[in-house]
């Protein structure tokens, strides 16, 4: 953060008892990348206090400078003042809004101006370390301004002795080299002088004639190279597999299993191979262990036992049902008899007219039809409907 430019001004300090005037005359919109940006409120500081002056200013000079702060920085400073000085009466902060417009920016600037004017009028707040840090001045003697009497602040410009105490708060002080532990200041000075003389003697050496001077290259101290420690195994390093020799060649297996062959076991999985030919069983050329081991294997009892051992039923049902008796099946109940369907009624057959029709039957039917009323017609329809319902339908 660059320090603000402190300029001499002809303005008069309005708050004579504090020697400090604060105001927020304007604001500035700072545009960022794309649609980002923020608003900075410019605080004008007019003061005659020595903590804000540099070495080129006189004690009676009045200086001014601008400090730009964002809303969040002013809010943080406001909360610090309230927590450290609860008895101070300050105007409230402007409200927070989601979308800030021009009217909100103007309202915030006016309220910030009112808050900082109240701070500059209060002698305790005007000399507080929180305010000095907020304005960009961090000095070891700034913390004592809050405890000073207001009359002392008024007479700072009239006392000529204060010019010795005035120093620049905006310039960095030179870093002091820390003393070497375990040595006094004289020993440290002697060691530094001795090192400088050795460097000069190494750099400039006269030739035998004394005419020319040449620079001798410095010898760098040899650093003993330490042996690198053995790398530690991590979870990603491959460890030596103790079972790696199980799947190697026959020669490696025989070499690794030589000590195991010395121990003779009484049991063998496979019989020794039959040499056959003219070699008899009691031949002295054979090993005694071979002749002994062939004895029990030639007996027929072992052959029968091996046959029984490897005889396995091929049918899985027989294997699963070994030793289990078949359960009797429960008797099923007889199904109830279904009654036979009723016989369908037959259609009434019309009697066939045999012989010629009577001559007087036609006019009689016409007279009967004419004599029928509504009830007779309804009865006729019902009779025919019952006949149609009694007839079986295929659908």
UniProtKB/Swiss-Prot annotation:
Residues 162-174, 194-206 have a biased composition (Acidic residues). Residues 249-260, 299-310 have a biased composition (Basic and acidic residues). Residues 143-310, 322-374 are annotated as: Disordered. The modification Phosphoserine is found at residues 3, 191, 254. It comes from the Eukaryota. SMART domains: PX. This is HCLS1-binding protein 3. The lineage of its organism: Eukaryota, Metazoa, Chordata, Craniata, Vertebrata.
């Amino acid at each position: 953060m660059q320090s603000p430019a402190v300029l001499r001004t002809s303005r008069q300090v309005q708050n004579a008892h504090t020697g400090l005037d604060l105001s927020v005359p304007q604001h500035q919109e700072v545009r960022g990348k794309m649609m980002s940006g923020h608003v900075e409120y410019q605080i004008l500081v007019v003061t005659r206090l020595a903590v804000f002056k540099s070495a080129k200013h006189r004690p009676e000079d009045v200086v001014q400078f601008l400090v730009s702060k964002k809303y969040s920085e002013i809010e943080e400073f406001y909360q610090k003042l309230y927590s450290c000085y609860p008895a101070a009466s300050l105007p409230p902060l402007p409200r927070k809004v989601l979308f800030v417009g021009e009217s909100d920016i103007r309202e915030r600037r006016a309220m910030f101006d009112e808050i900082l004017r109240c701070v500059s009028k209060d002698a305790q707040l005007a000399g507080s370390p929180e305010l000095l840090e907020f304005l960009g001045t961090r000095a070891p003697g700034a913390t004592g301004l809050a405890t000073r009497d207001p009359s002392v602040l008024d007479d700072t410009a009239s006392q000529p002795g204060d010019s010795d105490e005035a120093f620049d708060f905006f310039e960095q002080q030179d870093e002091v080299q820390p003393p070497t532990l375990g040595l006094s200041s004289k020993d440290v000075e002697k060691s530094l002088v001795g090192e400088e003389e050795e460097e000069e003697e190494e750099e400039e050496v006269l030739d035998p004639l004394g005419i020319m001077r040449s620079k001798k290259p410095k010898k760098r101290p040899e650093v003993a190279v330490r042996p690198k420690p053995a790398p530690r195994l991590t979870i990603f390093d491959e460890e030596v597999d103790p079972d790696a020799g199980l799947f190697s060649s026959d020669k490696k297996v025989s070499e690794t299993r030589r000590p195991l062959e010395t121990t003779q076991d009484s049991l063998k999985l496979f019989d020794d191979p039959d040499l056959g030919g003219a070699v008899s069983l009691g031949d002295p050329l054979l090993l005694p262990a071979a002749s002994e081991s062939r004895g029990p294997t030639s007996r027929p009892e072992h052959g029968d036992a091996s046959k029984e051992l490897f005889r396995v039923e091929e049918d899985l049902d027989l294997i699963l049902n070994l030793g289990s008796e078949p359960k009797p099946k429960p008797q099923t109940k007889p199904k109830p008899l279904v009654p036979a369907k009723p016989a369908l009624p037959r259609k009434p057959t019309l009697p066939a007219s045999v012989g010629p029709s009577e001559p007087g039957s036609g006019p009689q039917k016409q007279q009967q039809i004419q004599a029928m009323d509504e009830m007779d017609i309804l009865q006729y329809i019902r009779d025919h409907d019952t006949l149609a319902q009694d007839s079986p339908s295929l659908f």
